[in-house]
Amino acid sequence: MTSDVIANMITSIRNANLRKIKVIELPATKITKSIGKILLQEGFIDNLREREENNKNFLILTLRSQRRKHKASITTIRRISKPGLRIYSNHQEIPKVLGGIGIVILSTSQGIMSDRQARQNRIGGEILCYIW
């Protein structure tokens, strides 16, 4: 297991999209569960489940097919803030991805949330990734 669970999750999703794999399994942590819930709320994934095997928890993501043009699917996912270079933003400077089509996932003092929720709550935080 890698030390950067966010980068591991992003890389797994990106590789699954390139290989057209529909279901991926990731190590379950609080951060990956929170990011998975945001992806489910925003419509980028179809399903989110948790499975336990030998006292280890796994998160199972069912990715949305890109063939459905009327539904959101992940075309690009990019890690922004890295362990070696943290990127922070206040609520006024949170970037809009593709004019609001994509989302920004932030880690705030109130938990991990999307850019829309952070602007609505008027809080900033660390920019984790861009998704569109």
Swiss-Prot record:
HAMAP family membership: Ribosomal_uS8_B
Function: One of the primary rRNA binding proteins, it binds directly to 16S rRNA central domain where it helps coordinate assembly of the platform of the 30S subunit.
Subunit description: Part of the 30S ribosomal subunit.
Membership in a protein family: Belongs to the universal ribosomal protein uS8 family.
A biological process term (GO) from this entry: translation
Cellular compartment(s): Plastid, Chloroplast
The keyword Ribosomal protein belongs to this UniProt entry's keyword annotation: yes
Origin: domain of life: Eukaryota
GO molecular function: rRNA binding; structural constituent of ribosome
GO cellular component: a single term: ribonucleoprotein complex
Keyword tRNA processing among record annotations: no
UniProt organism field: Chaetosphaeridium globosum (Charophycean green alga)
Gene: rps8
Protein name: Small ribosomal subunit protein uS8c
Keyword line: Chloroplast, Plastid, Ribonucleoprotein, Ribosomal protein, RNA-binding, rRNA-binding
Major localization class: plastid
